[in-house]
Amino acid sequence: MVDIAREIFAASGFDVEYRNYGWARSLSLARENRIDGVIGALKGDAPDFVFPERPMGTARIGLYTHPESQWQYRGLESLNGKTLLVINGYSYSPELDRYIADYTDDPERVWVISGAAPLGRALRLLAQERTDTFAEDQAVMSWFLREHSGYPPPRLAGIAHQAPVYIAFSAGNPRSGELARLLDAGLARLAETGRLDVIKASYGLSTSD
């Protein structure tokens, strides 16, 4: 998404500076107008933000386990007796978000982690069998495993949710509407020329991702 945003905004004279923060902090910084927007947002993550009309792709939220686990995700009831690992501030699905809110104070059922590199930590916790399952977007997981060697690939135990994913802009920033419109126009242009598919393919993503 960063490469797509850079190409689109460069055409309008903007430089995109990407900074890596924990998700909850990213949302807070955007709300304080200290950054312009956040990458990879579902509408449930930040309903108060300004969203473009066009999504950047589709998020597919998977439930991952230790490679030797045989457990399958079949809805919330299948989480009984399991510890679900999640990242602070993320939205996963309406169903999972309610479950997390209900049990966020019960570490036997929901374990919330944060920080600038939570995915690597989550994979280590899975490998050490300190948690049962971890929720993450499939494309993010695939990219991370390609870019970071040394992590044992987890096992996908089921898909919990699919939803459009966006770059979202702070509602308090007076230029957020303009940035959202530029992004929409740029995405349409890249899709029409085929450039969007080329960028996605460089990350192992298809048109639908």
Q: What kind of feature is each model-predicted range?
A:
Residues 14-15, 31-40, 82, 118, ...:
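Alpha-to-beta junction loops
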Residues 66-84, 99:
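Flexible hinge/capping segments at coil-to-helix
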Residues 53-74, 167-170:
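Hydrophobic/proline-rich hinge and linker segments of small-molecule sensing/allosteric domains
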Residues 1-49, 115, 183, 189, ...:
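Extracytoplasmic small-molecule ligand-binding "clamshell" domains
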Residues 5-12, 54-56, 90-116, 123, ...:
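Ligand-binding cleft/hinge of the Venus flytrap
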Residues 25-31, 40-49, 98, 132-161:
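A ligand-binding cleft/hinge motif common to bilobed small-molecule-binding domains
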Residues 59-61, 149-184, 204-209:
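Periplasmic-binding protein-like
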Residues 2-11, 77-85, 90, 169-206:
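Extended ligand-binding regions for polar small-molecule ligands
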